[in-house]
A protein has these predicted regions:
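Expand to "…catalyze enediolate/carbanion chemistry for C-C bond making/breaking, isomerization
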Residues: 1-157
Length: 157
């Protein structure tokens, strides 16, 4: 219904319309959905991909909304489940790094760690904004059942 209502020249929901090669025809739509969802403390879920046997196409289209911050995408067929989990779950290295940021920030903002607000974790400065971003990645990883492969060790004075 949506594709027809905006008169988009395409028969495939979610794919770029023929002749539109200058960007993403859906960027404004996806960002509008995402901002509305976040404004109302709701999850942003991308719509269906009807070509149920085209798993690579599903991943490509899902990757677009995942990159923007969507929480997931409709799954119409069991063959799309693993693809959705792969696309919307963080990579192991990102999950581990998020957990390290959280542990390091907790330590360095504590009295034992010097009660500081911004600190270095290796070559990276971390602060409250870093902590908030890490919370998002960490929560997604935990929801996906990920286990950490690295641990934070406070420096020995």
């Amino acid at each position: 219904d949506f594709m027809a209502s905006i008169n988009m020249k395409s028969l495939v929901v979610g794919e770029q319309p023929p002749g539109y090669d200058v960007g993403d025809a859906y960027h404004h739509i996806l960002m509008s959905i995402l901002m509305a969802a976040r404004a109302h403390d709701k999850q942003a879920i991308d719509g269906p991909y009807l070509q149920i046997k085209d798993v690579e196409g599903y991943k490509r289209v899902a990757g677009r909304s995942a990159a923007l911050g969507f929480d997931g995408k409709w799954v119409l067929h069991p063959g799309q489940v693993d693809a959705a989990n792969e696309v919307y779950s963080p990579r192991q290295e990102d999950y581990d790094h998020a957990e390290l940021i959280l542990d390091a920030y907790d330590f360095y903002t504590s009295a034992e760690g010097g009660a500081r607000g911004a600190v270095m974790l290796g070559d990276e400065m971390i602060d409250e904004a870093s902590r908030k971003m890490a919370l998002v990645i960490s929560a997604k990883g935990r929801a996906a059942g990920m286990q950490r492969t690295q641990t934070f060790t406070p420096p020995q004075d």
